[in-house]
Amino acid sequence: MDLSCSCATGGSCTCASSCKCKEYKCTSCKKNCCSCCPMGCAKCAQGCT
């Protein structure tokens, strides 16, 4: 669990595998927001493009 995000890391999300986080809330999103958080984590997904 990332202290700045309400979701657990290690899950997967619905956006394309090539997306990156512009403004990430989770430190693990610095790598790839699509692989750091599970579905439903709006705090991570909002930074995806």
UniProtKB/Swiss-Prot annotation:
GO CC field: cytoplasm; nucleus
Annotated residues for binding of a divalent metal cation 6: C37, C41, C44
One Pfam family from the record: Metallothio
Gene3D superfamilies: Metallothionein Isoform II (4.10.10.10)
Claim: Metal-binding is one of the keywords in the record: yes
Protein residues bound to a divalent metal cation 3: C15, C19, C29
Annotated residues for binding of a divalent metal cation 5: C34, C36, C37
Keyword field: Metal-binding, Metal-thiolate cluster
Binding site for a divalent metal cation 2: C7, C13, C15, C26
Entry keyword annotation includes Metal-binding: yes
Binding site for a divalent metal cation 1: C5, C7, C21
Region called Alpha, residue ranges: 30-49
Residues binding a divalent metal cation 4, per UniProt: C33, C34, C44, C48
Biological process according to GO: cellular response to cadmium ion; cellular response to copper ion; cellular response to zinc ion; detoxification of copper ion; intracellular zinc ion homeostasis
UniProt-annotated stretches for the region Beta: 1-29
GO molecular function, one term: metal ion binding
Purpose of the protein: Metallothioneins have a high content of cysteine residues that bind various heavy metals.
Family of the protein in this entry: Belongs to the metallothionein superfamily. Type 1 family.
The protein, known as: Putative metallothionein MT1DP
UniProt gene name: MT1DP
